[in-house]
Design a protein with these regions (language model features):
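Well-ordered beta-strand positions
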Residues: 43, 88, 113-114, 136
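K/E-rich alpha-helical interaction surfaces of small helical-bundle regulatory domains
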Residues: 21-35, 133-139
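Short, hydrophobic/aromatic-rich segments at coil-to-beta transitions
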Residues: 20-25, 90-97, 118-121
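Bacterial Sec-dependent N-terminal signal peptides
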Residues: 1-21
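Short, exposed beta-strand-loop hairpins at the edges of beta-sheets
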Residues: 102, 109-113, 119-131
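Central antiparallel beta-sheet cores of small beta-barrel/beta-sandwich binding domains
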Residues: 30, 35-100, 107
Length: 139
């Protein structure tokens, strides 16, 4: 009985360690400046994953609108904006979705994956050209 309990506990620990999720809040870090920019909440809707900006860390930019957006988000507040759309899980990666850069209004193909349980790699790309940022889990 004691051995069974130890085995079950060990199995649950291993399972939860390996089953890390991208769902949650992430602090975005600008890959060019190293500055913290915002908090993005990633969530699952149906079989797909989405992300929206829930906080902007620079007080001067909290009221900013997406003036360079060319889709339905044009002139909408960046705070609360859905910037990641339609990601699908493929093993340990999430891909086939898009990400919006509210600074320039451009929409890129998107792929994300966990580097470790507290670091998320976020890649925006067009064909062979890409940028990858590391986002930090926010609690």
């Amino acid at each position: 009985m004691k051995k069974s309990l130890i085995f079950i506990t060990f199995t649950l620990l291993v399972y939860t360690t390996n089953a890390q999720s991208i769902v949650g809040k992430w602090k975005t870090i600008d890959d060019e400046t190293g500055k913290e920019k915002s908090i993005v909440e990633i969530y699952k809707k149906g079989d797909k994953y989405f992300g929206k900006i829930i906080d902007i860390l620079n007080p001067k930019k909290k009221e900013k609108n997406c003036i360079k957006c060319s889709d339905y988000r044009k002139d909408q507040p960046v705070l609360g904006m859905e910037i990641i759309k339609d990601l699908e899980q493929d093993n340990n990666e999430f891909e086939d979705g898009t990400i919006l850069d509210p600074e320039n209004g451009k929409i890129y193909d998107c792929k994300i994956w966990l580097k470790d349980k507290n670091t998320l790699n976020v890649r925006g790309y067009v064909m062979f050209f890409y940028r990858t940022q590391e986002w930090i889990r926010f609690s």
